[in-house]
């Protein structure tokens, strides 16, 4: 039941995602139907026509065709005989020569090799009409012929006389040459073959003189054995050959299309399905969603079953519709008129199932969706190519070869279609009664069996590859996967084995003895390899994690925290060592472990189209919750996470913070016993982060929690034990108090300075009181000083002095605390890696407090000024105008080159190897088919066709012999045939039989005979069924053998073999054989390969768009023209490479139609003009896609359909037999707007025109009108002509399409369609205003500072714009979705030079929207904004020259290094080339990124990526720098480094606007800030101004030791209430209390003394007291008015779990709204500033 429940959930998930991916789902279901529509269109435009009976006249075989009498030759035709040593053969040949009125020359050859060598090498061999080779060893020259005679007739390889007009279809109806490799045409038809030829037509047995020569040789043999008798007999005997009559029939030209094009179209229709399936499966794999579900208990096989059922249902619908369309008569015709619809459905379903499993198999070999999709689709197409060869040699293939070829599902499908079309041609269709009928020792039933076998094999391969080679993610299974799995010996949980103590034992706290170690890690290593280099991410890690505890894992960026989490969750395998979870080893028992595992990854693993509720419901039930419990817990989790108002929002529309909340909820739901949380609160605002802390504190009771974070206060609050990693090694581990005790150096005093602060004077004051004080940090407005613990008795005097001289010293506020976790972390990092000591280097004295640890301010100023210190000491001027455009163009071009260089495997495979491989395989198959298969000997006996029925009429008492009938019967029986003597007309009998039993008639009745006596003369008619290629000669052989037996006895026999001559030297060199249809094969195959090539140009553009790198480049100053034209230039250069290689391939294969000296320029021109047209089209369409993988798949499908379909339609309808040439011309003109059609038709016409020229030349038609023979096709001497078979109009169309699509691209980039829509909305202004007013009736801000700022801007706008770098006036932003959203509401502010302006607010408050408007990523709905005097709305190009932007999410290109990216943006900014290196090096030095500067960005940690994003914003000369949460994901050391850099940039005269969730960051950096709530400013001013206005109280935080928590907590509360009357308990986190104390009558020194004593009396682990912080003010604004302490506690009681653990506490409810009334100011502040203790 549990398995069925999980399966049901997975199916629900799949169908929800498919339903919400409307376009993909429609594409998956409709693309096969679109190809079906093409088939239906062809069916309806090739209607069957009724034809009456046809009788053909007899042909006299005693005469050569007229052709030989009129052929203009300089020399005589020659009759060659072999071996020449036999005089007997010479005499026989001379008798043959004398038979005809044509003057022949008799020529003998000693042996067959000499004859063939002469044919191949000597030009005179053209005159040899036939070689007669007798299979008999002559001992002497006069030795007679035996009675059993066998000889070969070797006519020329190419017919001389029979000129069949060439076909312009993808498949020829007939095979060229003598067709000796085939018994029947590959394309059977109900209509008579070669309808207009009485002698049978192709392969030309009569026209080429084969029958006449054969009969003459047979008569000569008879005369040799019975000279007189033979002479007498043939005086009164006349031998004729006559074609079978053909009864009334339906001539259906569609059958040719069905037999040949339908397999190709069916394959192309299902390739779309294969691409979508592969992409869907790989997308989940690439995003780690599959492995994430596995961690929730979903076995891998269950995952596959769910996917199979999902796609099975969707393809079932498609196949059902296809079956209905194919089998339902429309306008009295159907695609399959006679076949059983049930069998058609079963056949298509078997193929669909095989396609599904093929996609599954291909997905296991790849990790990236777009790579796997491209290669998977290519391989799927390749598996069809063998059929193109097999179909033309089907009867030559052995049964084993056929079986093996059908292991490719496409070959099996095409073979099945072949069976269906054959039965349709016979008029019976495929039925249950004939599925076992054998055609070439194979049957339709076997095809169905092979499709099912293919499905099983593909499934098996997928299972083995995934199990044994999980590649990047997952744990590989053992090779004995099918064997009985040995039961692992699980050691006792508490005694798995104590890990050895590391060398840093003094910093490892003793393990708790009374708790269960749920997770044990023993000597764990993880090494990553990249080429020859390796990186050790985890080095000898040993530690235990305990139930009921939160273990916090800290470390700098890249220390190995995420790697540890990935190993424990089974996402990656350890290189060495062991890890046990609940006693199960991760490398062996991951399935068991995952049943109790909850994981919140560092990067959200969410389904884009799942809602918040869907995620919680899905994962809750996967973990075992019942639907009712899951519903309740989902509602509870929504409330706890503050996501109630987003319950129905899809995850792709959530902000980053909301996604983190959802990921945490997924990990927590259903009570997972082991929680691994990788930076769970990254990106969350302060209220949300605190709510998550509450939630984790409540939920940890019976769980084991491993948490990583960069927030030290989070680690301090949540961590029962804290472990710190550095470079993969464990440095220390223990409780927060233990680590503070080990690493603490005393008390830390944090001083927030004013701009007027005199640092030297302040240092002297501190040094005067505390001589041993040490400077830890001096960044921005923040200064941190260490006060040794032994000098605590001097603190009171120091604090009194600082309070009294606060204004004089320039102190905004100061605070003191005992050692914090941040300081512990920094000290640990310094000890482990001295390179991190750049900013935190200890000072041995504060006097004179130099800042030598920082880069001087003047060095950073050079980045943002007009001069730059170089050796020449010349001022640096930024490039402008044309020079800037050239530099930017060069930067964009280098970016494209770098992408191609770094992704060379992808570029090489998709853009070069793939199209070339397709064309090479096609050429290999086609060349082998056309030039090799036909040159085989064929023995002309009835046994070749199996057992047949031979009707015959012989008159009673025939003049030839009264026993003639009996002799004929004996001869047939001896040959294994069935004689059937009839009375009357043989022709009438054959017509009757064909009408009575059309099924199988052509295979049962191949030849017949009629012996008619008229007076004393006998007429012998050898009747042949022309549906069989070689029946004319067979019928003649049958009659001649009977006559030979009459003359020489029953033992006499003649066996004739048709063995074409080898190709002559001229034929080989000039490829005389017409190969026009081969060109269409190549075109269709090549169009598919070129679709992948074309779609590959979207990968980078969509990738840049998805990470918003393109937007950042535009913001940095790149114009639309520069961005796209540089990309187009490089992509055209890239397009030239496969084009030139393609020409080389044609030269290698000697494909003259494309490799001729006149054709090569045309091929290159066609290809390059196609690239010119299609690349801008791909760029334009790429705007519709969000991920490179989906873009690649959809574009391949689109380009394949829009290129192959038009070419097929136009080519098929152009066939003269269909009678739709006018329609073909119309379609051709319509499809000129499609580059793929132009490419296909141009190449097709180029090939076809060349082949027709060869055809006319080969047939020696220079003296007659070749165009008449070609049935209307006009050979163009000038291939560039516009007329039929010219390529001129296609080249012109491609040349015009390029600018058209480029214009569309620029219009799309400029949001022209959005602007047009907005302009059109102006026709209904009253409606819009009324609608806006109804929805956005928002109150004006109440804060007087906000109102004053807005009023000032209104009054003095022009003056402010001139004097200030940034002015924002009443800016609003409305997102016009289904429900319009007001994101920013009339915001006004001014930012001056050397000012850092902070935007604070909850997630979704509108901060990023302001940035998007300032950078013009989003248009301003109303209002104005000015940068350096330029209006953003009208002068965006000029504005962008002055803006530097660090977006919220890293807009970085993974294929570039950090240095390369900075260089690129330096060029975009216009920094002269000679200064770029120094500029970039300086930024890297300041950001401490020199070590990783030359590594690829994809290897960077999150913190390093943020650092690089900030560096990009600083490049060049931006007057205004916008930093959107720049320090997200950074460790404390990196964060302080960033602060230092930003502060120095501000000091250099720049204007900075910053958003952040770190209040500490805002206090350190911001000179002014505003708090936003629901798009409005609620307050505005400097941090100190806001504290003075709203923070007139003190904040006391105290942390009681957990050991004494219950005992001392209440006593301490009573102490605070008694000591500080009026205090208010604002928050409580188990052992952490936060009080707000009234401000009046409190002194810093007095409070410090009281709390020092309380620390001892009440077992306090840590405490602090400070003026109400900026974070407290922020929380006050963002907290709902109704959220009082009592109400919060009441909500906690309701939401608490039914049986909470003993150490759990009530949890505070997170804010449920994003707005609150402005807090009222408290009474005036006391004269002294409080201190953080």
Curated annotation (Swiss-Prot):
Catalysed transformations (reactions): cholesterol(in) + ATP + H2O = cholesterol(out) + ADP + phosphate + H(+)
Disulphides: none
Bias-annotated ranges (Pro residues): 1718-1733
Residues holding ATP: 555-562, 1401-1408
Residue ranges annotated for the ABC transporter domain, each copy included: 519-752, 1366-1599
Maturation and modification: N-glycosylated.
UniProt protein name: ATP-binding cassette sub-family A member 17
Name of the coding gene: Abca17
Membrane-spanning ranges: 22-42, 262-282, 306-326, 342-362, 372-392, 403-423, 444-464, 906-926, 1082-1102, 1128-1148, 1160-1180, 1192-1212, 1230-1250, 1287-1307
Gene3D superfamilies: P-loop containing nucleotide triphosphate hydrolases (3.40.50.300)
Expression sites (tissue/organ): In the testis, detected predominantly in elongated spermatids at the late stage of germ cell development and in sperm, with no expression detected in immature germ cells such as spermatogonia and spermatocytes or in somatic cells such as Sertoli cells (at protein level). Expressed in the head and tail midpiece of elongated spermatids and sperm (at protein level). Expressed exclusively in the testis.
GO molecular function: ABC-type transporter activity; ATP binding; ATP hydrolysis activity
């Amino acid at each position: 039941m549990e398995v069925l429940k999980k399966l049901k959930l997975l199916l629900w998930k799949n169908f929800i995602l498919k339903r919400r991916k409307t376009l993909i789902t429609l594409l998956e279901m409709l693309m096969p139907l679109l190809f079906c529509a093409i088939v239906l269109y062809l069916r309806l435009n090739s209607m069957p026509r009724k034809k009456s009976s046809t009788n053909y006249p007899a042909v006299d075989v005693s005469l050569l065709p007229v052709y030989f009498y009129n052929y203009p030759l300089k020399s005589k035709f020659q009759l060659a005989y072999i071996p020449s040593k036999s005089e007997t053969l010479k005499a026989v040949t001379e008798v043959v020569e004398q038979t005809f009125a044509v003057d022949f020359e008799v020529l003998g050859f000693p042996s067959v090799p000499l004859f063939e060598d002469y044919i191949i090498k000597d030009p005179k061999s053209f005159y040899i009409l036939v070689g007669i080779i007798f299979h008999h060893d002559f001992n002497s020259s006069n030795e007679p012929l035996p009675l059993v005679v066998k000889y070969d007739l070797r006519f020329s390889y190419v017919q001389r006389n029979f000129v069949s007009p060439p076909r312009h279809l993808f498949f020829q109806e007939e095979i060229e040459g003598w067709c000796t490799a085939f018994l029947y045409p590959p394309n059977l038809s109900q209509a008579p073959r070669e309808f207009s030829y009485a002698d049978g037509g192709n392969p030309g047995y009569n026209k080429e003189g084969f029958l006449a020569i054969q009969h003459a040789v047979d008569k000569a043999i008879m005369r040799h054995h019975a000279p007189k008798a033979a002479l007498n007999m043939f005086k009164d005997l006349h031998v004729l050959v006559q074609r079978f009559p053909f009864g009334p029939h339906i001539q259906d030209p569609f059958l040719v299309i069905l037999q040949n094009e339908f397999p190709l179209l069916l394959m192309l229709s299902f390739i779309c399905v294969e691409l979508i399936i592969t992409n869907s499966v790989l997308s989940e794999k690439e995003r780690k969603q599959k492995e994430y579900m596995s961690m929730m208990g979903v076995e891998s096989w269950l995952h596959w079953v769910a996917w199979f059922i999902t796609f099975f249902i969707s393809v079932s619908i498609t196949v059902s519709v296809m079956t209905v369309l194919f089998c339902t008569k429309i306008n009295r015709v159907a695609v399959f008129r006679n076949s059983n619809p049930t069998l058609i459905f079963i056949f298509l379903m078997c193929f669909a199932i095989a396609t599904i499993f093929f996609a599954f198999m291909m997905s296991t070999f790849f990790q990236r969706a777009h790579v796997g999709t491209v290669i998977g689709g290519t391989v799927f197409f390749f598996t069809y190519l063998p059929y193109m060869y097999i179909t033309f040699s089907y009867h030559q293939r052995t049964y084993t070869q056929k079986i093996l070829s059908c292991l490719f599902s496409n070959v099996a499908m095409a073979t099945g279609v072949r069976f269906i079309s054959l039965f349709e041609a016979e008029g019976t269709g495929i039925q249950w009664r004939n599925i076992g009928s054998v055609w070439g020792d194979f049957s339709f039933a076997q095809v169905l069996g092979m499709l099912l076998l293919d499905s099983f094999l593909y499934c098996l391969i997928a299972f083995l590859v995934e199990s044994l080679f999980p590649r990047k993610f997952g744990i590989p299974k053992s090779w004995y996967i099918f064997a009985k799995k040995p039961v692992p010996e699980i050691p006792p949980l508490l005694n798995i084995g104590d890990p050895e103590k590391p060398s840093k034992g003094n910093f490892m706290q003793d393990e708790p003895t009374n708790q269960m170690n749920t997770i044990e890690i023993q000597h764990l290593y993880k090494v990553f390899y990249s080429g020859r280099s390796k990186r050790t991410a985890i080095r000898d890690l040993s530690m235990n994690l305990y139930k009921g505890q939160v273990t916090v894992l800290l470390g700098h960026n890249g220390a190995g925290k995420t790697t540890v989490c990935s190993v424990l969750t089974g996402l990656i395998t350890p290189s060495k060592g062991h890890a046990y979870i609940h006693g199960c080893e991760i490398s062996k028992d991951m399935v068991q472990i995952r049943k109790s595992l909850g994981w919140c990854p560092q990067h959200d693993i969410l389904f884009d189209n799942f809602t918040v509720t869907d995620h919680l419901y899905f994962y809750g039930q996967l973990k075992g919750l019942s639907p009712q419990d899951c519903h309740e817990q989902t509602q509870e989790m929504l409330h706890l996470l503050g996501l109630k108002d987003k319950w129905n929002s899809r995850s792709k529309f959530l902000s980053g913070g909301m996604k983190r909340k959802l990921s945490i909820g997924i990990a927590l739901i259903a009570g997972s016993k082991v929680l691994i949380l990788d930076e769970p609160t990254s990106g969350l605002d302060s209220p949300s982060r605190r709510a998550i802390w509450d939630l984790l504190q409540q939920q940890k009771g019976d769980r084991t929690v491993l948490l990583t974070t960069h927030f030290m206060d989070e680690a301090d609050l949540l961590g029962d034990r804290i472990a710190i990693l550095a470079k993969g090694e464990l440095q220390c581990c223990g409780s927060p108090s233990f680590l503070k005790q080990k690493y603490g150096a005393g008390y830390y005093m944090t001083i927030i300075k004013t701009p007027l602060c005199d640092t030297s004077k302040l240092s002297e004051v501190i040094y005067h009181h505390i001589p041993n004080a040490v400077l830890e940090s001096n960044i921005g407005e923040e200064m941190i000083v260490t006060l040794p613990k032994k000098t605590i008795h001097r603190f009171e005097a120091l604090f009194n002095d600082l309070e009294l001289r606060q204004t004089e010293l320039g102190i905004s506020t100061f605070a003191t605390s005992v050692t914090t976790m941040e300081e512990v972390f920094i000290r640990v990092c310094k000890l482990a890696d001295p390179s991190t000591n750049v900013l935190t280097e200890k000072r041995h004295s504060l006097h004179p407090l130099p800042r030598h640890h920082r880069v001087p301010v003047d060095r950073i100023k050079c980045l943002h000024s007009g001069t730059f210190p170089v050796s020449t000491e010349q001022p640096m001027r930024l490039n402008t105008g044309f020079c800037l455009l050239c530099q930017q163009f060069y930067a964009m071009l280098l970016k494209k080159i770098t992408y191609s260089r770094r992704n060379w495997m992808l570029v090489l495979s998709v853009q070069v190897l793939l199209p070339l491989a397709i064309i090479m395989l096609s050429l290999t198959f086609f060349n082998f088919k056309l030039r090799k298969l036909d040159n085989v000997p064929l023995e002309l006996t009835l046994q070749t066709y199996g057992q047949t029925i031979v009707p015959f009429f012989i008159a009673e008492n025939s003049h030839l012999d009264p026993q003639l009938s009996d002799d004929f019967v004996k001869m047939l029986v001896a040959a294994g045939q069935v004689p059937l003597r009839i009375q009357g007309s043989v022709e009438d009998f054959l017509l009757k039989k064909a009408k009575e039993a059309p099924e199988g008639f052509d295979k049962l009745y191949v030849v017949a005979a009629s012996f008619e006596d008229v007076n004393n003369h006998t007429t012998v008619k050898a009747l042949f069924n022309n549906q069989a290629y070689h029946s004319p000669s067979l019928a003649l052989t049958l009659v001649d053998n009977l006559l030979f037996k009459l003359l020489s006895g029953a033992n006499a026999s003649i066996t004739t073999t048709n063995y074409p001559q080898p190709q002559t030297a001229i034929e080989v060199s000039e490829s005389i054989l017409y190969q026009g249809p081969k060109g269409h094969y190549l075109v269709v195959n090549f169009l598919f390969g070129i679709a992948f090539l074309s779609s590959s140009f979207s990968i980078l553009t969509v990738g840049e768009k998805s990470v918003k790198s393109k937007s950042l480049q535009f913001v940095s100053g790149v114009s639309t023209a520069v961005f796209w034209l540089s990309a187009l230039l490089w992509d055209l250069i890239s397009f030239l490479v496969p084009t030139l290689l393609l020409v080389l391939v044609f030269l290698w294969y000697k494909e003259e139609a494309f490799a001729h000296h006149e054709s090569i320029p045309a091929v290159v021109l066609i290809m390059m003009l196609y690239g010119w047209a299609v690349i801008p089209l791909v760029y334009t369409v790429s705007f519709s896609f969000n991920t490179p993988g989906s873009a690649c798949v959809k574009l391949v499908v689109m380009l394949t359909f829009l290129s192959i379909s038009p070419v097929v339609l136009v080519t098929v309808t152009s066939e003269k037999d269909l009678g739709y040439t006018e329609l073909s011309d119309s379609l051709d003109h319509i499809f000129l707007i499609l580059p793929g059609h132009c490419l296909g038709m141009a190449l097709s016409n180029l090939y076809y025109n060349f082949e027709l020229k060869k055809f006319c030349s080969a047939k020696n038609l220079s003296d007659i009108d070749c165009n008449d023979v070609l049935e209307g096709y006009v050979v163009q001497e000038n291939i560039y002509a516009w007329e039929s078979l010219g390529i001129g109009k296609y080249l012109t169309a491609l040349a015009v399409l390029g600018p058209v699509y480029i214009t569309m691209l620029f219009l799309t980039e400029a949001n022209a369609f959005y602007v047009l829509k907005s302009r059109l909305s102006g026709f209904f202004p009253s409606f819009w205003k009324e609608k806006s007013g109804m929805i956005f009736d928002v109150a004006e801000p109440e804060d007087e500072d906000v109102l004053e700022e807005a009023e000032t801007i209104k009054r003095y706008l022009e003056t402010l714009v001139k004097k200030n770098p940034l002015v924002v006036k009443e800016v609003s932003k409305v997102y016009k979705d289904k429900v319009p959203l007001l994101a920013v509401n009339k915001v006004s502010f001014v930012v001056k030079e050397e000012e850092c302006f902070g935007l604070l607010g909850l997630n979704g408050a509108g901060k990023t929207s302001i940035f998007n408007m300032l950078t013009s990523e989003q248009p301003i709905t109303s209002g104005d904004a000015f940068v350096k005097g330029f209006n953003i709305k009208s002068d965006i190009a000029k504005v962008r020259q002055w803006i530097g932007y660090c977006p919220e999410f890293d807009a970085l290109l993974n294929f570039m290094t950090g240095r390369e990216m900075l260089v690129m943006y330096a060029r975009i900014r216009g920094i002269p080339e000679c200064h770029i290196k120094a500029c970039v090096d300086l930024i890297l030095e300041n950001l401490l990124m020199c070590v990783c500067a030359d590594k690829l960005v994809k290897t960077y940690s999150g913190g390093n990526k943020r650092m690089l994003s900030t560096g990009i914003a600083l490049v060049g000369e931006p007057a205004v720098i916008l930093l959107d949460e720049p320090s997200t994901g950074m460790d404390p050391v990196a964060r302080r480094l960033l602060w230092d850099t930003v502060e120095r940039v501000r000091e250099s005269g720049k204007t900075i606007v910053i958003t952040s969730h770190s209040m500490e960051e805002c206090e350190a950096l911001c000179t002014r800030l505003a708090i936003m709530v629901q798009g409005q400013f609620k307050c505005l001013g400097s941090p100190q101004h806001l504290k003075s206005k709203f923070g007139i109280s003190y904040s006391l935080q105290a942390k009681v030791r957990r050991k004494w928590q219950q005992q001392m907590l209440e006593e301490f509360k009573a102490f605070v209430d008694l000591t500080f009357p009026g205090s208010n308990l604002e928050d409580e986190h188990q052992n952490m209390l936060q009080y707000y104390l009234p401000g009046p009558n409190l002194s810093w020194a007095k409070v410090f003394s009281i709390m020092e004593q309380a620390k001892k009396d009440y077992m306090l682990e840590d405490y602090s007291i400070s003026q109400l912080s900026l974070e407290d003010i922020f929380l006050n604004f963002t907290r709902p008015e109704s959220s009082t302490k009592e109400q919060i506690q009441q909500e906690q009681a309701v939401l608490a779990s039914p049986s909470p653990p003993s150490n759990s506490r009530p949890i505070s409810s997170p804010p449920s709204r994003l707005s609150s009334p402005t807090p009222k100011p408290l009474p005036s502040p006391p004269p002294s500033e409080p201190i953080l203790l």
